[in-house]
Curated annotation (Swiss-Prot):
The gene is serS. GO terms for molecular function: ATP binding; serine-tRNA ligase activity. This is Serine--tRNA ligase. It catalyses: tRNA(Ser) + L-serine + ATP = L-seryl-tRNA(Ser) + AMP + diphosphate + H(+); tRNA(Sec) + L-serine + ATP = L-seryl-tRNA(Sec) + AMP + diphosphate + H(+). Consists of two distinct domains, a catalytic core and a N-terminal extension that is involved in tRNA binding. InterPro entries: aa-tRNA-synt_IIb, aa-tRNA-synth_II, aa-tRNA-synth_II/BPL/LPL, Ser-tRNA-ligase_type_1, Ser-tRNA-synth_1_N, SerRS_1_N_sf, SerRS_core, tRNA-bd_arm. Homodimer. The tRNA molecule binds across the dimer. Its main location: cytoplasm. Gene3D superfamilies: Bira Bifunctional Protein, Domain 2 (3.30.930.10), Serine-tRNA synthetase, tRNA binding domain (1.10.287.40). Pathway: Aminoacyl-tRNA biosynthesis; selenocysteinyl-tRNA(Sec) biosynthesis; L-seryl-tRNA(Sec) from L-serine and tRNA(Sec): step 1/1.
Length: 435
């Protein structure tokens, strides 16, 4: 959530910055609501002062023995109290309307983010590795998996439906090896604390990280199978779309001491997404699934450290690709392609031979104080009493399924076997080829 001061005192400037990312702020509605709020705030304060003043007069009248005057003043106070209650209710309604609009407003792009309308205008800043050329017909990961009976889409459809997968044997082991390798790298070399977190979260958590209220249709929500008959209230939960949600919410409603920052946390979880807006896209294979695993990286920093932390966190995700010897490119997202809560985002895109293109495998973002304001996640500087908002960052380190796609296709052999990258072999009991 943006600082409310920006929507009160810098409304036109804020609207202009939001327009750079394709968001039209309803300036006139906000301006009207703010004028009404200020007017009603003055009325509320005046009524409060009148009631307090008249209340004191009751005692004075009684002290003089003028009970008739005291009764008249008490009636006035009751009327003022009723008017004050109405004014407070109106003020609360106006504030709720303003907050409702504020919750739908995305983050402001950083000055270093290039202007653009969509993904076609993202800017490549680095390319690492050279895609291999093959002297045989390249198979995609689906064909490779089915040839080795390691990827079973038919059983997944029978069990759950489309966009799910059953992995078997060495393919399941490779999937597990990837997540173990990523966690070991991030905890042992990059300084992250491994976390095990819930896969079901409450709606407060989803509001905190920005999935709600705007993106509820992208989530899977729990609901009762039948009408509730118990007197116990039903608690609505949602499956996590990313470990960013539970991990970042660790600091919700907390004040962290300056000496304890930065916090660096990582978690391997399944992620669940409805892919509501993806009909017809990537219907074949593991690229776009309802359920997929991901190793997430989260950092909580002081404001002045967050941009350097974004470079560091992105570098940690890049290191995974480099050690796996997977060609990739790094792009900075333009204003029109940024995520809702992001101030600045780098995408890492891995080379997929069968598609002859780079596909996103990691998105690393500095959320600035956008999530922290929603979560009231703060820190206290040494020697200071008043806490400040932290900055939050997150990134994939990496998406396990898409990394597996890249390995299957980039390391395929003419006979359909897959060479295992050297850094993974210790997690595969020394196996050098599968398939």
């Amino acid at each position: 959530m943006l600082d409310s001061k920006l929507l009160r005192t810098e409304l036109d400037e804020t609207a202009e910055k939001l327009a750079r990312r394709g968001f039209k702020l309803d300036v006139e509605t906000l301006r009207t609501l703010e004028e009404q709020r200020k007017s009603l705030q003055v009325i509320t304060e005046d009524l409060q002062a009148q009631r307090n003043s008249r209340s004191k007069s009751i005692g004075q009248a009684k002290a003089k023995g003028d009970h008739e005057e005291a009764d008249r003043i008490m009636a006035d106070v009751a009327t003022l109290g009723s008017e004050l209650d109405d004014a407070k209710a109106g003020l609360a309604e106006l504030q709720q309307q303003i907050e409702s609009i504020a919750l739908s407003v995305p983050n402001l792009p950083d000055e270093s983010v290039p202007y653009g309308k969509d993904e076609d205008e993202n800017v490549e800043v680095l390319r690492w590795g050279t895609p291999l050329t093959y002297d045989f017909e390249v198979r995609d990961h689906v064909a490779l998996g089915e040839l080795a009976d390691g990827l079973d889409f038919a059983s997944a459809v029978k069990i759950s439906g489309s966009r799910f997968i059953v992995m078997k044997g060495q393919f399941a082991r490779l999937h597990r090896a990837l997540s173990q390798f990523m966690l070991d790298l991030h905890t042992e070399e990059h300084g992250y604390m491994e976390m095990y977190v819930p896969y079901l979260v409450n709606h407060d958590s989803l509001y905190g990280t920005g999935q709600l209220p705007k993106f509820g249709e992208d989530l899977f929500h729990t609901s009762p199978l039948t009408e509730q008959v118990s007197d116990v209230p039903l608690k609505m939960l949602s499956l996590i779309p990313t470990a960013e949600v539970p991990v970042t919410n660790m600091v919700r409603d907390t004040i962290t001491e300056e000496a304890d920052l930065p916090l660096k946390m990582t978690a391997h979880t399944p992620c669940f997404r409805s892919e509501a807006g993806s009909y017809g896209r990537d219907t074949r294979g593991l690229i776009r699934m309802h359920q997929f695993d991901k190793v997430e990286l989260v950092q909580i920093t002081k404001p002045e450290d967050s941009m350097a932390a974004l470079e560091e966190l992105t570098g940690h995700a890049e290191k995974v690709l480099q050690l796996l010897e997977l060609p990739y490119r790094k792009v900075i997202l333009c204003t029109g392609d940024m995520g809702f809560g992001s101030r600045k985002t780098y995408d890492l895109e891995v080379w997929v031979p069968a598609q002859e293109t780079y596909r996103e495998i990691s998105s690393c973002s500095n959320m600035w104080d956008f999530q922290a304001r929603r979560m009231q996640a703060r820190f206290r500087r040494q020697g200071e009493k008043k806490p400040e908002l932290v900055h939050t960052l997150n990134g994939s380190g990496l998406a396990v399924g898409r990394t597996m796609v890249a390995i299957l296709e980039n390391f395929q052999q003419a006979d359909g076997k897959i060479a295992i990258p050297e850094v993974l072999r210790k997690y595969m009991n020394g196996v050098e080829f599968i398939g």
